């Protein structure tokens, strides 16, 4: 007769430690128990259900919040500069936390910098690249169902989507923080945060600057978010330089006017460059033109930052670009010390480290 098999007791699983109370960012209404903004309005219902702590749009930040984010970003930069290539000296503040990245559109800098930021703070990453083709979205699953599923695996979601407003829908659905990493031609708030942070680092101030936004201003979510965010500062002047088919939309112009921000449209890049502290160049976004390739070809190449622009640009000024670059900034500009776009991209790591820390564990 076979001997009875001994049974081993299962090890006890320790209870998870309670999550710290998050310090909410201002201006977005609370997710639970919020008062509806307007009866019978679906959009108002979505807006009312947003929880403090989501990063959805540039308008949600006031100057106090920006100051705090930038202070933490400087701490993250100092931390990174003081750590070794093998990780010695790095923070483990997000150890035990898991970030999910859901990217329905291509990304290099945003996705990789978020993933690097999470890992450099000790956290882990679940990643979905090309989610439009290689996730259940290809089978027809709704964004809301995807968010409800993914939030069960993670502590925070970073979402890039091809539809404007998708991040709001995700935030209204999820019970964990959602970060908008770009929603179609809508907004890209974390890019705006790193852009404004970069301007402060490069120029030394934010109040009183003159900013030239150049290129695809109709489809570029980065310029929209930057315009919203820079309006928080005093005595700003913005120049819009773009081909006729991709001019800045009226909603941004109306918002700037309502905030007392002076703006001007111009067709002369050289004249604008001679007046500006920052030239913010963008590519013409072919993917937004659909079948109207003729309009894309007409717009592409009209405004290029090259040696002629450098010759009139003030010595203290900088050239920025959200990247990727095509041919709208010539390669020979890269060696000029005023070319700040790669320093700008590096700042994205520090800003995103700061956001993850503030959203998940607080200051």
UniProtKB/Swiss-Prot annotation:
SUPFAM superfamilies: Aspartate/ornithine carbamoyltransferase. Its main location: plastid. Residues 1-36 form a transit peptide. It is found in: Plastid, Chloroplast. GO terms for cellular component: chloroplast; cytoplasm. GO terms for biological process: 'de novo' pyrimidine nucleobase biosynthetic process; 'de novo' UMP biosynthetic process; cellular response to phosphate starvation; glutamine metabolic process. Residues 1-21 are annotated as: Disordered. Pfam families: OTCace, OTCace_N. It catalyses: carbamoyl phosphate + L-aspartate = N-carbamoyl-L-aspartate + phosphate + H(+). Residues 11-21 have a biased composition (Pro residues). PANTHER family: ASPARTATE CARBAMOYLTRANSFERASE (PTHR45753:SF6), ORNITHINE CARBAMOYLTRANSFERASE, MITOCHONDRIAL (PTHR45753). Catalyzes the condensation of carbamoyl phosphate and aspartate to form carbamoyl aspartate and inorganic phosphate, the committed step in the de novo pyrimidine nucleotide biosynthesis pathway. This is Aspartate carbamoyltransferase, chloroplastic. The gene is PYRB.
């Amino acid at each position: 007769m076979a001997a009875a098999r001994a049974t081993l007791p299962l090890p006890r699983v320790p209870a998870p430690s309670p999550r710290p109370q998050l310090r909410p960012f201002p201006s977005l209404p609370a997710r639970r128990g919020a008062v509806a903004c307007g009866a019978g309005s679906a959009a108002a219902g979505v807006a009312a259900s947003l929880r403090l702590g989501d990063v959805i749009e540039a308008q949600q930040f006031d100057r106090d919040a920006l100051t705090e984010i930038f202070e933490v970003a400087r701490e993250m930069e100092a931390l990174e500069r003081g750590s070794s290539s093998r990780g010695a000296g790095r923070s483990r503040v997000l150890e035990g936390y898991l970030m999910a990245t859901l990217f329905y559109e291509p990304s290099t800098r945003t996705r990789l910098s978020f993933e690097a930021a999470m890992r450099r703070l000790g956290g882990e990453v679940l990643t979905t690249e090309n989610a439009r083709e290689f996730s259940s979205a290809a089978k027809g699953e709704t964004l809301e169902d995807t968010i409800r599923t993914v939030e069960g695996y993670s502590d925070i979601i970073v979402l890039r989507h091809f539809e404007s407003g998708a991040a709001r829908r995700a935030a209204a659905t999820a019970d964990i923080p959602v970060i908008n990493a770009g929603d179609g031609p809508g907004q890209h708030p974390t890019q705006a945060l790193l852009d404004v942070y970069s301007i402060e680092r490069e120029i030394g101030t934010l109040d009183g600057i003159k900013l030239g936004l150049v290129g695809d201003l109709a489809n570029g979510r980065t310029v929209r978010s930057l315009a919203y965010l820079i309006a928080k500062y005093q005595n700003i002047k913005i120049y819009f330089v773009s081909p006729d088919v991709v001019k800045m939309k009226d909603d941004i112009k109306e918002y700037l006017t309502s905030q007392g921000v002076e703006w001007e449209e111009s067709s002369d890049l050289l004249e604008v460059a001679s007046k500006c502290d920052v030239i913010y160049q963008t590519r013409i976004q072919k993917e937004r033109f659909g079948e109207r390739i003729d309009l894309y070809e007409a717009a592409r190449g009209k405004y290029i930052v090259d040696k002629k622009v450098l010759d009139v640009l003030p010595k203290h000024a900088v050239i920025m670009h959200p990247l990727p670059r095509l041919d709208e900034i010539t390669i020979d500009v890269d060696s000029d010390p005023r070319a700040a776009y790669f320093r700008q991209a590096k700042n994205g790591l520090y800003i995103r480290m700061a956001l993850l820390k503030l959203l998940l564990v607080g200051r």
